Design a protein with these regions (language model features):
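Hydrophobic/aromatic ligand-binding patch that stacks against planar heteroaromatic rings
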Residues: 114-118
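Glycine-rich phosphate/pyrophosphate-binding loops
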Residues: 119-142
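Short beta-strand segments
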Residues: 9, 35-37, 67, 94-97, ...
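Short, glycine-rich nucleotide/cofactor-binding loops
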Residues: 8-15, 105-106
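Electrostatically charged, flexible surface regions
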Residues: 140-268
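Conserved acidic residues
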Residues: 90-91
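Glycine/threonine-rich flexible loop motifs
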Residues: 100-109
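A cross-family phosphate/adenosyl-ligand binding-site feature
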Residues: 2, 6, 16-87
Length: 268
């Protein structure tokens, strides 16, 4: 039986130790191609670079760098013919991120966005993140085992009929999983939902030596709301969280609100 082909990306850049550890662990059961950002792209979310040209370079055999965002990297790999991949991958894994992507972090995370870009294009995908206090090789091995499980349980969506033009093939969303590893070197594993990860949001105004104002934004302290079965609760009790993410963001529970809004607007 042929070995699976797995595309590995991240948002920390192709030199990141977490990516290298995870790619090495995945090579135990699959062939790996890496396509990752040239530089760190944390918190770039799902942005694509459309206002300037991108550059792609092969920095080592089957290791590619793109001077763009994580989503750019996966987009280029999946749509660039055989420049990066010899064929469509069986799975895309993004990570292993240096730091967590719990709860609402998924909306900002470049790590999660790289995986989401693949899922939008019909390729099963997994985002993997580890606490800075996690033992790297052990965390990578745990994430690789979950990736191996996913690639066997969620095979790629069937190829559409030959009559479908190639640019529009494999557009059916595929499974998307978010994995977070807490501190330590051995962990239980839990199937979870997204939790609530709340930051002390800060805007800090400063002045440069010439008296011109500049500012920094970002979260300060962080706390987790207690929510049974959540990824944040799993983290707090020392368990690896495995969370399935939806690509359909429709809030069915708010349909009454939107219907009332529509009713309140006179027809033109």
């Amino acid at each position: 039986m042929a070995r699976p082909l797995i595309l590995v990306s991240n948002d920390d850049g192709f030199r990141a130790q977490g990516l290298r550890a995870l790619a090495d662990a995945i090579r135990r059961f699959a062939d790996v191609v890496v396509c990752a950002p040239e530089t760190e792209q944390s918190t770039t979310s799902h942005s694509l670079t459309l206002t300037r040209p991108l550059r792609l370079r092969e920095v080592a055999p089957a290791v590619f760098a793109v001077d763009g965002t994580p989503a750019d990297c996966v987009y280029v790999a999946l749509n660039g013919g055989t420049r990066v991949l010899p064929r469509m991958p069986d799975l895309v894994v993004s990570g292993m991120n240096h730091g967590l992507n719990l709860g609402t972090d998924v909306f900002y995370s470049g790590t999660v966005a790289a995986a989401r870009e693949a899922a939008l294009r019909g390729i099963p995908a997994m985002a993997a993140s580890a606490d800075v206090g996690a033992e790297r090789d052990a965390a990578a091995a745990a994430c690789a085992k979950l990736a191996e499980s996913l690639v066997s349980l969620a095979p790629i969506s069937p190829e559409p009929a030959a009559s479908v033009p190639p640019p529009f093939r494999r557009k059916v969303p595929a499974p998307l999983v978010n994995v977070n590893v807490p501190p330590g070197s051995a962990w239980p594993v839990a199937s979870t939902r997204l939790g609530l990860r709340l930051y002390e949001d800060i805007v800090e105004f400063r002045q440069d030596p010439r008296g011109r104002e500049y500012l920094w934004i970002g979260g300060g302290g962080v706390r987790h709301e207690e929510l049974a079965g959540s990824d944040t609760s799993a983290y707090d009790r020392g368990a690896i969280s495995v969370t399935a993410l939806l690509l359909d963001l429709t809030s069915a529970g708010d349909s009454v609100l939107t219907q009332r809004m529509v009713t309140a607007v006179p027809s033109s």
